[in-house]
């Protein structure tokens, strides 16, 4: 097994790191304090290809592999976790579903703009009464001639208010349950679309989360993404890839916290020596680094499987997201402890990292949902099992998932 990176992968990692250190780190505390959206910084990252990492060059993207993508996200999250999630959403749950399910006209209209970073995308599944239970959404889409009229409310929309295209999920056939949900490409200029409010969040404050109001929002029939009733398939396939991105985000935050803690331990003195000379601090740092490396391996393995054309990545991305999101919360807690009172101050980077990390166990599937996905796959594999050492996994039988839309069913 080769754990080395190609020259292109190292170049992407190093270029993004240099940009983040020079352009983003100097302003992150101020932007976090003010809750200022990182529009200029995201535009520059888009010009570098970070908004369309996985999009083929023919559509304006970088045409990079998933390993390069997670390396990019880790470097961004190491300094600004909120910026990383804005990029993850545009890449994983907007561009990829559009690339797979979009018509030729939809691809031409939206994909190059997304890939070049000229606009961001937003994924609109969650509603006030429907989080983990996606089939419980209440937003309706009713056809009137050549348009659909959407009515409902979408909540916790990352990039909401800043995106140029929204994938909105609505019920076209309420009687069909999970098979009655369809996906639509919605522009903020469409009649009936309104950003109702922005959330005042504990963390990820430089990435805005909005509530959307849809009142007879008119969406042309040609803006339906995929077939009627296939909306949750579109959503879950996107989330399979998105969870790899969130795993990378967790690794990046944790790496930033580790570096800050190690530097502090080498300069902070107590009882006549640096605190890094005490075994208690050394063991905390050692545990932090070990957990980060374990999470990094899970994330990069899931990314490698995706690049290898594996028939299913859902359980792998769920494991990566589960472990990384819980790992980073343990790591940032240790980082605050190592910093002592300084770690409780807004002047400390680890204070922000502590707040930013908390949501990772919630969005793009809670830890509890990840465990359900993992266990369902494990218990349903009654024939052939995935080779845990890296061979291409064989898709589980139907019993592995009672909702087929939760399984990854194809490549890009």
Question: PLM features: residue spans?
Answer:
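Alpha-helical interface subdomain recognition
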Residues: 1-89, 101-106, 113-118, 143-147, ...
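Short glycine/proline-enriched turns and hinge-like loops at secondary-structure junctions
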Residues: 64-65, 133-135, 159-164, 177-180, ...
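Short Gly/Pro-enriched turn/cap motifs at secondary-structure boundaries
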Residues: 114, 129-132, 156-159, 173-175, ...
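A short, Trp-centered hydrophobic/proline-enriched beta-strand micro-motif
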Residues: 117-125
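Hydrophobic, small-residue-rich alpha-helical packing segments that form membrane-like cores
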Residues: 132-133, 148
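Flexible, small-/acidic-enriched active-site or ligand-binding loops
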Residues: 136, 189-220
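A short core secondary-structure module
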Residues: 147, 151-195
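Long, acidic (Asp/Glu-rich), low-complexity accessory segments flanking structured domains
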Residues: 216-233
């Amino acid at each position: 097994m080769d754990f080395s990176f190609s020259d292109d992968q190292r170049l992407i990692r190093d270029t993004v790191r240099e940009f983040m250190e020079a352009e983003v780190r100097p302003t992150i505390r101020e932007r976090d304090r003010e809750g200022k959206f990182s529009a200029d910084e995201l535009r520059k990252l888009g010009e570098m290809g970070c908004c369309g990492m996985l999009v083929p060059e023919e559509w304006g993207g970088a045409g990079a592999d998933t390993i390069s993508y997670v390396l990019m996200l880790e470097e961004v999250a190491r300094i600004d976790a909120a910026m990383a999630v804005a990029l993850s959403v545009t890449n994983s749950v907007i561009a990829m579903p559009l690339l797979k399910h979009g018509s030729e006209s939809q691809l031409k209209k939206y994909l190059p703009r997304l890939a070049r970073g000229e606009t961001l995308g937003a994924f609109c599944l969650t509603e006030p009464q429907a989080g983990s239970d996606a089939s419980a959404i209440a937003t309706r889409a009713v056809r009137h001639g050549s348009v659909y009229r959407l009515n409902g409310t979408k909540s916790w929309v990352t990039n909401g208010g800043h995106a140029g295209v929204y994938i909105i999920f609505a019920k076209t056939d309420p009687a069909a349950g999970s098979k009655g949900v369809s996906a639509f490409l919605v522009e903020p200029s469409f009649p009936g679309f309104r950003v109702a409010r922005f959330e005042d969040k504990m963390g990820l404050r430089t990435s805005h989360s909005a509530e959307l109001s849809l009142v007879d929002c008119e969406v042309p029939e040609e803006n339906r993404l995929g077939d009627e009733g296939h909306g949750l398939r579109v959503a879950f396939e996107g989330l399979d890839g998105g969870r790899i991105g969130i795993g990378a985000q967790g690794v990046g935050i944790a790496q930033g916290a580790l570096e800050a803690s190690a530097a502090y331990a080498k300069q902070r003195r107590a009882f006549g020596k640096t605190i890094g000379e005490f075994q208690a601090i050394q063991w905390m740092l050692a545990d932090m680094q070990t957990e980060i490396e374990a999470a990094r391996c899970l994330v990069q393995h899931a990314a490698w499987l995706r690049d290898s054309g594996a028939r299913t990545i859902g359980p792998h991305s769920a494991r990566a997201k589960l472990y990384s999101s819980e790992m980073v919360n343990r790591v940032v807690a240790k980082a605050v402890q190592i910093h002592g009172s300084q770690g409780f101050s807004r002047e400390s980077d680890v204070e922000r990292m502590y707040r930013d990390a908390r949501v990772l166990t919630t969005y793009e599937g809670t830890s509890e949902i990840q465990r359900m996905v993992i266990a369902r796959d494990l218990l349903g594999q009654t024939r052939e099992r995935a080779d845990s050492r890296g061979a291409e996994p064989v898709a589980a039988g139907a019993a592995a998932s009672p909702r087929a839309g939760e399984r990854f069913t194809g490549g890009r």
